[in-house]
């Protein structure tokens, strides 16, 4: 097996590391899997521990998607393998082997993957999230909007079928992981950014 193929399991294992749990334990915060929305992600950590903890979680989760792709770029891997490596990191965050395959929703890790594909694509997705969040104050709605548009951004900027397909699958999984949020949005029960979830 060519050594570059080992980047797929490496990306998955790195994705399986929970930044939210590590940050929360380090800072003495409640376990985000047990408190708040019970999602080990930056938004829940923001509610439980404030901006500093949330930023550290966001950077950690995004790095899980970005680092394997930076390594892959340095090895000049093929486009299909490059796409698979990014997708593996994302799946690792959603279904982590270290936490009984119960992970987060993948927003920050998906951002890291998109930045790894091409930084302008990641920037466009981030600006979409920020714009929707500024207008509506819903983290989940912002994530859904960015997820829906991400494959379009990849297609327009990169034109790579492999990367478009990988991004499309990431987007579908991300939307699926937000099904509870979608139900609450439709019922008018979703917590806005800055609100404490009890």
Swiss-Prot record:
The chain crosses the membrane at residues 3-23, 81-101, 113-133, 153-175. It is a multi-pass membrane protein. GO terms for biological process: phospholipid biosynthetic process. Its main location: membrane. GO terms for molecular function: acyl-phosphate glycerol-3-phosphate acyltransferase activity. SMART domains: G3P_acyltransf (SM01207). It is an enzyme of class 2 (transferase). Pfam families: G3P_acyltransf. Probably interacts with PlsX. Catalyzes the transfer of an acyl group from acyl-phosphate (acyl-PO(4)) to glycerol-3-phosphate (G3P) to form lysophosphatidic acid (LPA). This enzyme utilizes acyl-phosphate as fatty acyl donor, but not acyl-CoA or acyl-ACP. Belongs to the PlsY family. NCBIfam families: glycerol-3-phosphate 1-O-acyltransferase PlsY. This is Glycerol-3-phosphate acyltransferase. It comes from Methylococcus capsulatus (strain ATCC 33009 / NCIMB 11132 / Bath). The gene is plsY.
């Amino acid at each position: 097996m060519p050594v570059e193929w080992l980047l797929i399991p490496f990306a998955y294992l790195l994705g399986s590391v929970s930044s939210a749990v590590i940050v929360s334990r380090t800072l003495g915060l409640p376990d985000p899997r047990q408190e708040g929305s019970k999602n080990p992600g930056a938004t829940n950590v923001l509610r439980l521990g404030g901006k500093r903890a949330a930023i550290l979680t966001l950077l950690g989760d995004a790095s899980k998607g970005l680092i394997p792709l930076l390594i892959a770029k340095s090895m000049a891997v093929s486009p299909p393998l490059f796409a698979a490596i990014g997708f593996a990191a994302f799946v690792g965050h959603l279904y982590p082997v270290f936490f009984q395959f119960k992970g987060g929703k993948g927003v920050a890790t998906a951002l890291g993957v998109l930045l790894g594909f091409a930084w302008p694509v990641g920037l466009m997705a981030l600006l979409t999230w920020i714009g929707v969040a500024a207008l509506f104050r819903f983290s989940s709605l912002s994530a859904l909007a960015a997820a829906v548009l991400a494959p379009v951004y990849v297609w327009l900027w990169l034109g790579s079928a492999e990367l478009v397909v990988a991004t499309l699958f990431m987007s579908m999984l991300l939307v699926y992981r937000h099904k509870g949020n979608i139900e609450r949005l439709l019922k008018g029960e979703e917590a806005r950014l800055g609100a404490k979830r009890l």
